[in-house]
Structure formats: C-alpha cells, structure tokens
Swiss-Prot record:
ATP binds at K630. It is an enzyme of class 6 (ligase). A motif ('HIGH' region) lies at residues 42-52. CDD domains: Anticodon_Ia_Leu_BEm (cd07958), LeuRS_core (cd00812). The gene is leuS. Keywords: Aminoacyl-tRNA synthetase, ATP-binding, Cytoplasm, Ligase, Nucleotide-binding, Protein biosynthesis. This is Leucine--tRNA ligase. Belongs to the class-I aminoacyl-tRNA synthetase family. GO terms for cellular component: cytosol. It comes from the Bacteria. Pfam families: Anticodon_1 (PF08264), tRNA-synt_1 (PF00133), tRNA-synt_1_2 (PF13603), tRNA-synt_1g (PF09334). It catalyses: tRNA(Leu) + L-leucine + ATP = L-leucyl-tRNA(Leu) + AMP + diphosphate.
Amino acid sequence: MHELYQPREIEAAAQTFWDEQKSFEVSEQPGKDTFYCLSMFPYPSGKLHMGHVRNYTIGDVISRYQRMLGKNVLQPLGWDAFGMPAENAAIDNNVAPAKWTYENIDYMKTQLKSLGLAVDWSREVTTCKPDYYRWEQWLFTRLFEKGVIYRKNGTVNWDPIDQTVLANEQVIDGRGWRSGALIEKREIPMYYFKITAYADELLESLDELPGWPEQVKTMQRNWIGRSRGMEVQFPYDQASIGEAGALKVFTTRPDTLMGATYVAVAAEHPLATLAAQGNPALQAFIDECKGGSVAEADVATQEKKGQATSLFVEHPLTGEKLPVWVANYVLMHYGDGAVMAVPAHDERDFEFATQYGLPIKPVVRTSAGDQTPAPWQPAYGEHGELINSGEFTGLTFQDAFDAIEAALVKKSLGQSRTQFRLRDWGISRQRYWGCPIPIVHCDTCGDVPVPEDQLPVVLPEDVVPDGAGSPLARMPEFYECSCPKCGAPAKRETDTMDTFVESSWYYARYASPHYEGGLVEPNAANHWLPVDQYIGGIEHAILHLLYARFFHKLMRDEGLVTSNEPFKNLLTQGMVNAETYFRMETSGKKTWINPADVTLERDAKAKVISARLTSDGLPVEIGGTEKMSKSKKNGIDPQTMIDQYGADTCRLFMMFASPPDMSLEWSDSGVEGSHRFLRRVWRLAQAHVTQGPSTGLDVAALSDEQKAIRRAIHQAIRQASQDIGQNQKFNTAVAQVMTLMNVLEKAPQDTPQDRALMQEGVETVALLLAPITPHISHELWKQLGHNEPVIDAGWPAFDASALVQDSLQLVIQVNGKLRGHIEMPASASREEVEAAARVNENVLRFTDGLTIRKVIVVPGKLVNIVAS
C-alpha cells in the first residue's frame, strides 16, 4: 500500500476495474429486491457544472447504498438532447446542431465517468436519435387517433427572438424564459395534449405520493387549480347588443353576486369584437391586449387597463343593467373569457373599479367591517355574512352559495361547475432541432398520422439553421410527400414537438432501451417501474414533473405500464452557490469578476475584510453568495477540482457541506478540508496494513477501553445507516465517520486485540464511505485483505450489544453551570443517581450554605441541582 494518498492513480484503477467487470450493468432478476434510482438527465450544453456534480453524486450515493443492502440497483444516464440552445449555438458557430450536440455528449460523458458514477451506461439514451424519438412518434399517432392529441387554432405566446411558441410556464414576467424577449400573442394552428382530461386524477393521485416534498405537491395542486363554483348567465340587454343571448361567466363566489357592478370580457371575446365595430379607440385597445402575454401570472401582475363599451347585460337576479368593459386582466382561454366584477370583494376588480370610477358595493360583512374604503385590504376577500343582498342578507357563505344557486337554477340562469386552472398542453414548436410531428396534411383526407411502418419521420441532421423560423418549412425534400391514405401529393408537418415531451417518458425507456417492438418492453418496464428515487431541482416542480406524471398515465392507459405514478420518492436538491465579485462601471452596469481572479484579505477570524483584483491590485465589490452561473462568473469548473483533488474529494465536499435539499455554499477551504480528511483516512489505513494481517477479534475479552472504541464503531454504523437510509442526510453520515476517525486515530495498536479492533474500525470507515467516496473505499477494502470488491460487500450492521454500556459518565450541574462529572452504573436508578450527585465533592462545595430546592435528572446525560 503506497504511503501517500494518490487519488489520480486510485481513481483510475477503480474505474478501470468497474468498466472491465461491467460492475453496474444490470438485468431483471425476478425474486430479488430492485431499486431504480434516477437523477434528471442533463442537457448536453458542453461542460458539466457543479450543479450536475451535486445532482449525480446524490443519486450515486443512494444507488451505491441500496446496492450494499443487497438490492438489484438500476442507475441509468442519458441525454436530453433536443432544444433551442443547440440551434442557437449552431447559428453562432455555423455548425449543424447534431454535430454540436454529439461532440458535447462525448465530452460530458467523459466528465461524468471521471466522477466514478455507478451508472449502467449500456442503457444510455439520447433523445435526438431516431431510435429514441421513433417511439415518441409512435405514441403520438396512437394518441392522435384516440383524440388525446388534437389540432386547433390557439392564442399562443410567441417569442419573436426564438421564433417559436412558448408554454405559459415558459413565460416569466412577460418574457421568454430563454431569450428574454417580450412575448407577443398570436393565433396559429397547434397540436395539444388533452392533459385537462386527466386533471382530476393528476390532482387526486398526489395524495398517493408520501415520498414527495409537500412543497412540490402544493405547487402542482395550485397549478392544476381545481375550483368549485357556478356558471352564471347574464342575459343580453337587447337594446344595446341587438340580439338575444347571455354572457356566461364562471365564479367561485356566487355569494357575492348581489355585489356585481359591471362585467369584463377578454379582448378576443365576441362581445368585444361586436363593440369594436365603428369604435377605433376600442379596436386599438383590443389590438394592444392581443400583443401581451397569455400567461396568467403575467396578467396578474401587469397594470389593469380597460375600455368601456356601449353594451350592457342584465343582472340575473335583479335585472339591473351592468356595463360591459373590455379588460386586459381577463383571459379568453380561462373560463369563458368573461368575469362578473365584484369590486368590493375581489382585488383585481377593486383595482380596476377604483381606476375607472366604477361602483363598489359591499355585500359581505368581513373582519374589516361593512365598508370597503381604499386601499384594498386582504380582509375584503373574506367569507362572511351577507349584507345589502336583498332576500339573501344574513346568510353565511355556504348557505348563500346554496340559496343563490337555487335561485339561478330556478331561472335557468346558472348551474354548479368545477373548473381547472390547468390548460391543455400545446406542444407545437416552430423550431428545427426537435422531434418531427408525425402528421401529413392532405387536401382530401385532412390530418393523417404517419403509419407505424413508416416511422420514424427522421429529422435531417446536416442542417445549419439561420435563426429565421423553422428550416424544415423551407425544405421541400423534407415536407413533400404522399398521403398515407389516398396517395395524393401531400405536405408533411414541419413543426417539431416541445422538448418537454422527450423528458416526459425517458425514465421508462431506460427499462428496455434497445427494445424494437415498442416504446417499452412491458415486462421490463413493470419490473423496474415506478422509479424508487428521483432526484432533480425544484425548478422542475410544475413543468417536467407534471408532464411526466401525465405521460405515465397515458402509458398506463395504453397498456404499457401498470403503475399509476412514475416516481415513488422525489428529492429536490438545493442549488450550489458561490461568492460573487464585481466592479461598478460609470454607466451603472456591474462587471462581474471570476472569484479565481480575486485576492482576499481576511481578519483573525477568517472573515473577508477586503477583495482586490489580482491583476491590478485595485478593490472589487463583494456581491455576496449567489447561484453559480455564467452571467455572474462565479462558476467553478468541476474538471479543475477533479484534476487537482480527485473525484472523491469533490464528492465528499458536496455531501458534507450541506444537507442535499438545502443550498450548498462553495468553499475552497471546505474542499481542502475534505481532501485532508481523506489523507487522514489513508494514513490510518496505511499504518494499520503495514503491520500485517490481524487476528480475529475476541469480543468477550475486550477491555473497557477497547469496548469504548468498539462502541464508537457501532454507534457510527447505527447513525450513518439512519442518516443515509432513512433521512438522506449525507452530511451527518460523514460527520459520524469523522467522529469515528477521531477515536481510531487515538486507539492503541499494541496487542493483537488492538489490531483486530483497528481492522474492524478501518473496515467500517471504508464501508460507510463507500457510497460517498467509492474510489478510496475500493482500494482500502482491497488492501484490508478482501477479495470481493467493496461494491459487493454488504452494508455493515451494527452490533446492539456493542452499544451497551456498563457505566455512564454524567454531567453534574449546579444551577445550570457545569461543576463536574460522576460515573454511574448504566443500570442505576434515578434515585441512585440523585443520591450520588448530592454527595459529590463539587456539588457540596457549590451548594455550601444553600438549600437544594430541586434535582433534575436527564437519564444517561446529566444531573442539574437547583439550589438557593
């Protein structure tokens, strides 16, 4: 065994062994417990970042631990390879997205392998390859024929920079999530998944996921947004509208109906179109509204604007005429594109009515009283007893709901209804680098799905996009085809699918990635699925995780899987943060500086007191810790860390610095500390191994000192097992090993018993660290005399008898202050402990002249004597 810890050699040897032995390639083994651990697959952006390292290390620790429990563990990896960044990079570098993507995959795969991940690379999937997306197209055609996918014109978020449609979730503060461009509204034909047909199940089956963070489930519940309310009809005022009919609105607060003072409609509503005839000002306002975002979150925060029309509707219960307004806060695609406005009890209506001088009529007595003066108070929206509501005055919320519902039903002007905030998922993208939509447009036959024997519709990979819309729409050699039904000349669909489609089912393909008879091989899929542990960032709580749950139910209904949910347990890892530094330019712009280019000055307590740019020695501003990013220039290259310290050091730091679900603050000194610890482990093992083999341990013959050492070993096993296996607190598991190391480093190695005990101790360190620092553990286990690799060694079981103590050392306090210790038999009663404490020399000294009022005994820990 080499005297010095040499991570480069150790890690290369371990990885070569795993590769040659195909250690992590698995197959179905009926009768053996399985564990499917999956971290969200990466986009091949070019290089790993520390977020990747943390994500995949967490998954690897869990996978290796479960393997040591004797389970058949699947941990696959692949590439979420379609998407706009590849197109943008291709435009910038004049290279085909396929070439850029495959080169990035090769480089990043090498980086991932250098981390020593226990991944079954034989199951690698790449979503931009035809052998993957062929099955996506296959499922698309089946769902299209069933009506689960349909085509219609829709108002969409159009990104003018990326020249594509964005889902509502991809619009942030009115801007595209990737380009940052202001979003426009457009009407175009699109393909939609009918996710709303599964809204109830998606909502209710969240209760079947106890292993998911409550925060994620709440976010999904809110996004699905089921609400019970009423559809209310406001009859048209025929004198102003010129025809019979009624305006339909949905409300969750029918109890406030008597407080409605106007109605508001979306810019696209037929009444808005009617009112705009001959009204240029109103038409201009409608056009302005149509240019805004269709994302509900943006509408909620934007300035409320409106235009009056000359139209009126009638209140369904009183017959009072209510004016019709066109308002930018009403969405055509939500509800019926119209709202009944009750300004006294709805914040948006209140803001709008205040701005335009519309009546505000309180009809609910709230904790704020009977009036609703400006500014808006949250109390105005409370449920309460009705006031100013005619025959309904005095009723509470539910009684008022029921009574007003009955009155409306009697007049055929209302009915109960359940509504969802969730909208159908529009998946058409006017981009090149995505999965082609397998539809042919025929003048005679309409939209015809491509037959299974003609799949896949292959995306040409030699295209270099220029950024002006979809290249496929300008490629006759791609879109010119014959109709599969009638054989007439037809046109292939040139839109591609939203890349969230690929990531909605990849976890299932891993179960049988080479299967050519379908999307999944059912036996393999049902052997491995659902995923036991899924790991990824909370930023995917709504988009990816909701879509994957939806897809799993689609696959279940197609008979491909039998389970209802894709992921049993979900761990949302925290971000990796690092210090930021900048200089403020005269223009007010911040120029960010890489931490590696900054020299820090610290005080005696290691607190940073100044920062200077190394190159010129002049001060820079300290910006605080923020998520590692290219824009802030505070990212750390994982490859640099691996080359300098080794993968085990990086893995250890990532697991020790913070619990996995919390943010981690990068620290160079923390990395160095992790490296020093591994050197200590190596030195201890090297010193032990150098003395030659040890004899077996005679537990019955252990001295008290040796029992204490063995107790520390088994306390570490018990606690680390709980920390890793139950709590997923890898940082405290590492802390247990560090505590054990402190004991072992002081332990004597004089007798055969000492050496046998040290053998057990060092073996335990190697085993407990094996999931976290697998390379050094691999080498230590071999050097400790074992023929089988540590990955095939079982997780250590603690010996309960080793934890039993004959005697305990208890802390003695007088009035809460430490005054000494006493040693007592472990079996001593509370009375015996108190009696011993009362006659302790220090207790007598510090209670001299005082009266003991109370004795508090905390069993096994301390005695506190209260005296005055």
